[in-house]
UniProtKB/Swiss-Prot annotation:
Organism, scientific name: Vaccinia virus (strain Western Reserve) (VACV)
Family named by the database record: Belongs to the poxviridae K6 protein family.
Protein's name according to its UniProt entry: Protein K6
Organism lineage string: Viruses, Varidnaviria, Bamfordvirae, Nucleocytoviricota, Pokkesviricetes
Pfam families: Hydrolase_4
InterPro entries assigned to the protein according to its UniProt record, in alphabetical order: AB_hydrolase_fold, Hydrolase_4, MAG_DAG_Lipase
Length: 81
């Protein structure tokens, strides 16, 4: 198996081809009622150190779909991360 792949909870194979290889990967997870854009400056600072930064808007937050701030099942929500 390639180091440039992962599987999601539905067992879908996700592949990417990096242009450069970062020193590390940081995932920024926002809090309730927030969105990933709040961390743009932090992400840029970390990225300038050669570290790959990833974040997303959780379902029901920011630009993602879903009823705002509504999580019916944390098990399902956890599958999105």
């Amino acid at each position: 198996m390639s180091a440039n792949c992962m599987f999601n909870l539905d067992n879908d194979y996700i592949y990417w081809k990096p242009i450069t290889y970062p020193k590390a990967l940081v995932f920024i997870s926002h809090g309730a009622g927030k969105h990933s854009g709040r961390y743009d400056e932090l992400a840029e600072n970390i990225s300038s150190l050669g570290i790959l930064v990833f974040s997303h808007d959780h379902i029901g937050h920011g630009r993602s779909n879903g009823e705002k701030m509504m999580i019916d099942d944390f098990g399902t929500a956890r599958g999105n991360y």
